[in-house]
Amino acid sequence: MLSIERLGVGRGGQMVASGIDLCIEAGWALQIHGANGSGKTTLLRVLAGLMPPAGGQVSWYGANVRAHPEKFRRDLAFVGHANGVNDDLTVLENLRFATLLGAGSGAPDGTSSVPASGRSGVAAPPSRRDMLARAGMLPLQHTRAGCLSQGQRRRVALARLMLDRKPLWLLDEPGDALDDSASGWLHECLALHMQDGGIVVATTHRSLQTPAARTRHLHLERSGAWLD
């Protein structure tokens, strides 16, 4: 469970959002909406523990993410605008590297903050080859990532998410640069992750197709932040 308590978010010395209170349970999604410059990416970075909040706190299963960063990061997968893909590695090597880093949920002892009841285990771990096929990247598996288009790099970054299987996904505009086919695959990945008890928090200019009954929407506007 990701808990946000009286959270304030600032940028450039100015408050862009304040007083945000909500809890995101296992199997749920939060979509963050707002115009350019509204603070969506800043808020996501605060939730990831990459920036300090201007007020309040963020907790992961009861532990403050700033006070216990190692405990939090073992369960966190963050994909920003830069994708985090290594240009010097091939597509397949990027996935192999991600699998090695994600072994045991990133924890030396294989532990996680998520209780067993929080993950259903419905989705079986896909193979790298299967994931590349689903992403439409199998013909390019031996191509260096630096030679890929932005949309193809985005597919590689999203494929790593499914292989890594971290319980919390923080995604900055995950649908950017994706064509209709890749967008459909993205929405399938999000639904499978939630079905398996994972949490999705994503900024987006347009609504993502996550299960409506388990999705909340946070809107950032000049007048303040509001939930529906």
Curated annotation (Swiss-Prot):
Disordered: annotated segments: 106-126
Pfam families: ABC_tran (PF00005)
Domain ABC transporter: 2-227
GO biological process: cytochrome complex assembly
SMART domains: AAA (SM00382)
GO molecular function: ABC-type heme transporter activity; ATP binding; ATP hydrolysis activity
Binding site for ATP: G34, A35, N36, G37, S38, G39, K40, T41
Subcellular location: Cell inner membrane
Enzyme Commission numbers on file: 7.6.2.5
Enzyme class, broadest EC rank: translocase
Stored Gene3D superfamilies: P-loop containing nucleotide triphosphate hydrolases
UniProt xrefs under InterPro entries: AAA+_ATPase (IPR003593), ABC_transporter-like_ATP-bd (IPR003439), ABC_transporter-like_CS (IPR017871), ABC_transptr_haem_export_CcmA (IPR005895), P-loop_NTPase (IPR027417)
Reactions accelerated catalytically: heme b(in) + ATP + H2O = heme b(out) + ADP + phosphate + H(+)
Membrane topology: Peripheral membrane protein
GO CC annotation: plasma membrane
Main location: membrane
Keywords associated with the record: ATP-binding, Cell inner membrane, Cell membrane, Cytochrome c-type biogenesis, Membrane, Nucleotide-binding, Translocase, Transport
Family annotation (NCBIfam families): ccmA
PANTHER family the record matches: ABC TRANSPORTER I FAMILY MEMBER 1 (PTHR43499:SF1)
Role description: Part of the ABC transporter complex CcmAB involved in the biogenesis of c-type cytochromes; once thought to export heme, this seems not to be the case, but its exact role is uncertain. Responsible for energy coupling to the transport system.
Subunit note: The complex is composed of two ATP-binding proteins (CcmA) and two transmembrane proteins (CcmB).
Family listed: Belongs to the ABC transporter superfamily. CcmA exporter (TC 3.A.1.107) family.
Record's protein name: Cytochrome c biogenesis ATP-binding export protein CcmA
